[in-house]
């Protein structure tokens, strides 16, 4: 199992959880972004900087993902593509995104996109809380444990 992180918008507190998990569980974590990333020195953690551009990092992740890999993202279209390839997806809030629950999220995203394009202000997601961080850490641990057991 490899862990892929859509790192452009990944909060630092979530990256810290990922770094600790990579070290403790000896799992390969790869952060992908179109800007330089700071990562701790570790044989289990690497950062890949892709060229700037719309969805370049997302497309790179989708190309690399294999069935059973874990993807960390809040990007719903990226999550949908990763799920189609057999990836497991959790959001930075610890929500497990699946084939069963991704379609309604895609529909809501598209609806909000239409609202924004018509000039409606829809706001953004709430700031991450300590509870979100804990939910993420718990979900990450569960999925890594399952992934290591299955491999």
UniProtKB/Swiss-Prot annotation:
Family statement: Belongs to the UPF0178 family.
NCBIfam families on file: PRK00124.1 (NF001095)
Pfam families: DUF188 (PF02639)
InterPro entries for the chain: UPF0178 (IPR003791)
Organism of provenance: Saccharophagus degradans (strain 2-40 / ATCC 43961 / DSM 17024)
Name of the protein in question: UPF0178 protein Sde_3033
Source organism superkingdom: Bacteria
CDD domains the UniProt entry points to: PIN_YqxD-like
